[in-house]
Amino acid sequence: MTVYLVSRHQGAIDWIDHMGYGYDEHLTHLQDYAALATGDTVVGSLPINIVADLNALGVTYQHLSLYIPENLRGVELSAEQLSALNAEIETYQVKRLP
């Protein structure tokens, strides 16, 4: 079972490291699902359709969750800002409906 951190944001990577969340491999982008296996975990801020794909493969998805005020949208946040915004890692399970 491998834990993948998928993020291109240095602040998120620094925050996850600072908080002590362990991961095996860092990816800046999830190109395809070929390397993923049932029982793996992906941590990131991915679109819901990709989370549904991952869950259908038996991959656990953990989301870097936070509420970003309007004035910080589009801004590269630091680890300190993520902490101030009460960021947390939450596990989600998404199922695509017919």
Question: What feature does the model see in each segment?
Answer:
Residues 6-8, 40-46:
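Short His-Asn-centered micro-motif
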Residues 24-32, 48, 65-71:
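Short, acidic/turn-prone active-site loops that include or flank metal/cofactor-
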Residues 47, 52-53, 61:
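Extended, well-folded catalytic/binding cores that form a central cleft or groove in large enzyme
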Residues 17-18, 54-57:
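Short amphipathic alpha-helical segments
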Residues 60-98:
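Ser/Thr/Gly-rich flexible loops in soluble cytosolic domains mediating phosphotransfer, phosphorylation
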Residues 1, 33-40:
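Flexible, charged surface loops at secondary-structure boundaries
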Residues 12-13, 33, 50-52:
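Short, well-ordered alpha-helical microsegments
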Residues 1-27:
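Short, charged N-terminal beta->alpha structural module
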